[in-house]
């Protein structure tokens, strides 16, 4: 190994002090911060929130201090349909209801994974991966579908937010304490030679404790409820005796098996035209597995535009923290000028960022519009976020087309939009990716 010598450091000092621009930038950045000093005027001008195709102006939602973006994005696609179908002024489905059942199911999923890996050492990478974070707030499209299909949905008025759903840190801390403790109990029980019936009985006993903890923290979810509302014409509507499943069937009425996940992961280990899944990724035991079809980025954008032209918004996953201005609501590759400002070259491409852990899916949002040029090519995209209405334009963001190319990884579209060849590839036996693959990262936040 080569040490850093004083002579080398002296050389760096001299080079820095010889560049008069650096002194000005040092003053600007130390007083204002990197982003404020390097923010470009050009990016704000080019990414105004005006779009040739704009599907909704509904009020945005707010996930607050939680990692429920994937749920919010899915429920937002549903509520847009409901607002239009039932002529509502505004409406939200309960994100907390889906959150409760996700925590419950993830706990069982984790314990089943612990049982399945009981023959491996605690130091094995898979067991260590499980124990590092037994569960968290994140998830994937197929995971939220599994929850909707099993538990339905309810209006937010029926099961509102709690402190622990809006700010989930305490909940996650103590739920993970319980799960790690339960993992030890089950592994030690299995080490004694206990049969599966005994192990499952113990697991059910542990799940009762977890269920009690969740119910006390989030509130006990309703089994039946009434739903009343007034439409835009002030007509009153009410219905009683609903269950979460019957409410979903009557008021949402989407066939979720008609939707598929399409990704753009341009790395050497993931050839296009193949389907993929991620080992140990899921929540509901016995439900559909997480599955993606990998396609080139141009095809992914073409599919998203086709769905929006048909009048339907698009759930999508991206790395939202990359070159973004949260306050202004701008996602653009040129929002900050590091090259002119600091002589820093950020040239790593999308594949390189994935391979070297610089980028991964961190956030799910909804595409609700796009600005197309005369030839039908996208210039910028309208993004419905779930960070409240104090950021962006009333909570909506603008993503430049270049930003979409570099930092968008997944969309969910109707499978009827796929070609016969693409659909066959999606339905083929998927290639299994490692549990820590970046294509599973959205579920790890």
How does the language model describe each region?
Residues 373, 379-445:
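Conserved catalytic-core surface of thiol
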Residues 2-22, 72-75, 88, 400, ...:
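Bimodal feature
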Residues 2-58:
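N-terminal regions that are enriched for targeting/export leaders
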Residues 54-58, 350-352, 384:
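Short helix/strand-bridging catalytic loops that position acidic/His residues to coordinate divalent metals
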Residues 44-314, 391-394, 401, 409:
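Active-site nucleophile-adjacent alpha helix/oxyanion-hole segment immediately C-terminal to the catalytic cysteine
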Residues 287-362:
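Long, positively charged binding patches that form subdomain-scale interaction surfaces
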Residues 69, 148, 355-388:
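Catalytic nucleophile-His microenvironment captured as a short glycine-rich beta-strand/loop
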Residues 72, 316-319, 368:
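Short His-Asn-centered micro-motif
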């Amino acid at each position: 190994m080569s040490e850093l010598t004083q002579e080398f450091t002296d050389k760096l000092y001299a080079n820095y002090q010889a560049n008069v621009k650096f002194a000005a930038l040092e003053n600007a950045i130390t007083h204002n911060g990197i982003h404020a000093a390097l923010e470009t005027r050009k990016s704000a001008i080019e990414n105004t929130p005006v779009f040739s195709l704009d599907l909704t102006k509904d009020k945005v939602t707010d996930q607050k201090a939680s990692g429920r973006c994937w749920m919010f994005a899915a429920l937002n696609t549903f509520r847009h349909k409901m607002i239009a179908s039932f002529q509502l002024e505004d409406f939200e489905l309960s994100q907390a209801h889906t959150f409760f059942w996700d925590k419950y199911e993830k706990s069982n999923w984790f314990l089943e994974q612990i049982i399945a890996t009981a023959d491996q050492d605690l130091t094995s990478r898979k067991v260590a991966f499980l124990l590092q974070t037994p569960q968290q707030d994140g998830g994937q499209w197929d995971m939220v579908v599994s929850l909707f299909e099993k538990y339905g949905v309810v209006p937010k008025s029926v099961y509102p937010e709690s402190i622990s759903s809006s700010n989930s840190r305490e909940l996650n801390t103590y739920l993970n304490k319980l799960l790690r403790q339960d993992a030890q109990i089950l592994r030690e029980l299995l080490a004694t030679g206990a049969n599966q019936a005994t192990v499952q009985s113990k697991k059910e006993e542990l799940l009762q404790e977890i269920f009690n903890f969740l119910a006390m923290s989030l509130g006990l979810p309703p089994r039946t409820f009434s739903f009343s509302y007034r439409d835009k014409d002030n007509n009153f509507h009410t219905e009683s005796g609903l269950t979460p499943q019957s409410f979903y069937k009557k008021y949402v009425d989407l066939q979720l098996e008609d939707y598929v996940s399409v990704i753009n992961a341009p790395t050497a280990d993931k050839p296009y035209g193949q389907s993929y899944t991620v080992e140990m990724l899921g929540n509901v035991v016995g439900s559909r597995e997480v599955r993606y079809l990998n396609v080139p980025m141009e095809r992914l954008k073409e599919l998203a535009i086709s769905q929006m032209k048909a009048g339907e918004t698009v759930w999508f996953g991206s790395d939202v923290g990359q070159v973004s201005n949260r306050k202004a609501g701008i996602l653009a590759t040129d929002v900050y000028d590091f090259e002119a400002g600091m002589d820093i070259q950020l040239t790593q491409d999308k594949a390189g960022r994935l391979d070297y852990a610089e980028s991964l899916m961190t956030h799910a949002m909804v595409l609700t519009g796009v600005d197309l040029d005369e030839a039908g090519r996208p210039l910028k995209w309208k993004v419905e976020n779930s960070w409240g209405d104090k950021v962006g334009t009333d909570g909506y963001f603008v993503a430049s087309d270049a930003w979409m190319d570099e930092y968008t990884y997944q969309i969910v579209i109707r499978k009827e939009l796929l070609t016969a060849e693409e659909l066959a590839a999606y339905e083929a036996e998927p290639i299994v990716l490692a549990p820590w693959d970046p294509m599973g990262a959205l579920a790890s936040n």
